[in-house]
Structure formats: C-alpha cells, structure tokens
Regions:
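N-terminal Rossmann-like NAD(P)+-binding domain of SDR-like oxidoreductases, especially those catalyzing
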Residues: 1-186
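Short, solvent-exposed loop/helix junctions and linker helices
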Residues: 4, 106-109, 157, 190, ...
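C-terminal substrate-binding subdomain of Rossmann-fold SDR/epimerase-dehydratase oxidoreductases
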Residues: 14, 23, 204-323
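Conserved strand-to-helix beginnings and helix N-cap segments that scaffold or border functional pockets
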Residues: 37-38, 67-71, 98, 193-194, ...
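NAD(P)-dependent short-chain dehydrogenase/reductase
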Residues: 42-45, 141-143, 153, 165-236, ...
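Residue-level recognition of oxygen-bearing side chains
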Residues: 73, 83, 110, 192-196, ...
Length: 323
C-alpha cells in the first residue's frame, strides 16, 4: 500500500490503520511548509517506530522526473502496489487565491496527473483519490449528491474537481481503476493548525476571542477522522471510476458546534464575528446513499464525542502552537 501525503492530518491516521491491519505501507510526503513541520513530525511519531512502514520524503513532481533509462522513482515506488491512496494536496480554501494559485495547480492538478501516469505504467490494483466537498460550491440543493452539477467557488475547489476529472479520464481511457472520495469538513485529533476547531481550541485555551467568519448560522457536515479513514479503506472495493461522498451524517450550524466545543472542553468561547471570506460556502451536507449502498459506509462518531476526543488531544499537545 502507498499513501501520499502521509505526514498530514488524515494521511497519518490512514497509514496507522493500514499498518494495524497488517499491510506494508510506503508513505510519501514532501513536508510542504504550509504549516510547521513540527506538527507533521508529531503525526508520524508512532509510524516511524512501526514495523511495516517506510517513509519517502520527496515531492511527487520531483519523484516523477524521468531518468535517462528506466522508470521514474515514482513508478518504482508504486510498482505492484495493491492500492495507492492519493491524499497529498495543497490544502486551504482561503489561501488559494492570487499568486498562490500556482502552488495549488502544481500540487493538486499536476501532482495528481503524475501519480495517475505512474500508476498506469506501474500497474497498481486501485487508486483512491481524496477529493473535497469544495467541488460542489455554494448550492441550496441539499443534501449534496455525487451526480449534482459541481460549481466550485474557490480556486482550491477548482483544482480538486480538475483532479477528480483526471481520475475519471485515466479510468476511461487507460483502465486505471480509480475511486474519488469527497470529504466533508474533517475534524479530530491532529487536525491541521489552520482548521476551525484547532483554531477555536487554541483561542479558548489562551483566553482570546475566536474568529468566526459569517453569522454562525452557516451549516457544515462535520466528519470525524476515524470515520473518514474507515470510508477510505472501504473504497478499495468501490466501483471503478465512481465518486463517493464521505460525511458525518448530520448538518450543524457553526454556532451549535462552538457551543458543543465549549461543553466538551470545559472552556468558554468569546466569539468575534468577521466578514465571510471569499471561497466560503453557506452550507454543506453529504448525501451518503451511494457510499452506504456500495461501500457499507456509515459514520459512527457523532459531533459531541468527536469534539471531546479532539479537545482531549489538544490538551496533550507538546508542540508550541505558534512554532
């Protein structure tokens, strides 16, 4: 098994699950400096000691560069893999505007294309691509179904949708067995330091006002990381060329989520309202019918329990948040 983006929030959880299930796992990560390396090192602390895990610290584009003779390093790493879980990406909706867009096209679009091309040449059993609910854009048609028209409202969402289309093209034209998964607002232990609940917990621990964009009445389908990992693993048996939503199974306002976070953490939140940011959507909610019927996917962890676990993890952080 190969996991790209293995040092990240979801990638590290997935690799741990695969190793625990008895698989040999090759993890690939460039340690992109979108957030401090110390967080990623902490994510990998257990895996580095695990039997059956090896790490390749290099970017996908660098690994894909051809040699004078023979396959690229990326092809060698992927050769004969039972599954390539492609989670590597440039994250963040709000940071994807302006000059930063080049980074997103390189990492999310071109990075996916070189993985798919290497998989085509190397002959892998399956490619599971981590997409995002951001591809849907701002819609009042809820819950969101996989066959809906996708009109993303951020450059990040555009790159994730483009990568989905590449997966479909490589399946249709070259027979590469791909599955694309649209993740809905993933949270839990190891959540990236730029993500909402992590930021909220930091502000609450430091006694500062937390910044909430919009009125707080916008809704999200929050999905606990263990449920996402379970869905990713099940996707190995998904229909080739298919797209699946992976959500938490409920729709909650941001204000409700903050009140729940207060309750489970024992801390109070001073909420400071900010203007809605470009690229943000009003509502998300996953239709899980296809994932339930094809994959047997059913989320197990509700928001209160999931936030309790994230709050407990945050209290144990040994990293200096501002590092």
């Amino acid at each position: 098994m190969v996991v790209t983006g293995v040092a990240g929030f979801i990638g590290s959880h997935l690799a741990e699950r695969l190793v625990a299930d008895g698989h040999e796992v090759v993890g690939i990560d460039s340690f992109e400096d979108y957030y401090p390396r110390s967080y990623k090192e902490a994510n990998l602390a257990g895996l580095r000691q695990a039997r059956g895990f090896s790490l390749v610290e290099e970017g996908l584009l660098a690994l894909s560069r051809g040699r004078d003779q023979g396959p690229s390093r990326l092809e060698e790493l992927l050769a004969g893999a039972g599954c390539v879980f492609h989670l590597a990406a440039q994250a963040g909706v709000r940071a994807s505007w302006g000059q930063s867009f080049r980074i997103y096209t390189d990492n999310n679009v071109l990075g996916t294309q070189v993985v798919l091309e290497a998989c085509r040449r190397a002959g892998v059993g399956k490619v599971v691509y981590a997409s995002s609910s951001s591809v849907y854009g701002d819609t009042d048609v809820l819950p969101m179904r996989e066959d809906a028209l996708c009109l993303p409202v951020s450059p990040y969402g555009v790159t994730k949708l483009a990568a989905e289309q590449l997966c479909r093209l490589y399946w249709k034209n070259h027979g590469v067995p791909t599955v694309s998964l649209r993740f809905f607002t993933v949270y839990g232990p190891r959540q990236r330091p730029d993500m909402a609940f992590h930021l909220f917990l930091r502000a609450m621990h430091e006694g500062r006002p937390l910044e909430m964009y919009g009125t707080g009445n916008q809704t999200r389908d929050f999905t606990f990381v263990d449920d996402i990992v379970g869905g990713i693993v099940r996707a190995v048996d998904g229909r080739d060329g298919a797209v699946y939503n992976l959500g938490g199974g409920s729709r909650v306002t941001l204000l409700e989520a903050i009140r729940t976070l207060e309750r489970v953490s024992g801390l109070s939140a001073q909420v400071h309202g900010e203007a809605v940011q470009a690229g943000d959507v009003e509502h998300t909610w996953a239709d899980l019918t296809r994932a339930r019927e094809d994959l047997g996917y059913t989320p197990q962890v509700g928001l209160e329990e999931g936030l309790r676990r994230e709050a407990g993890w945050y209290r144990t952080l040994e990293i200096t948040p501002s590092r």
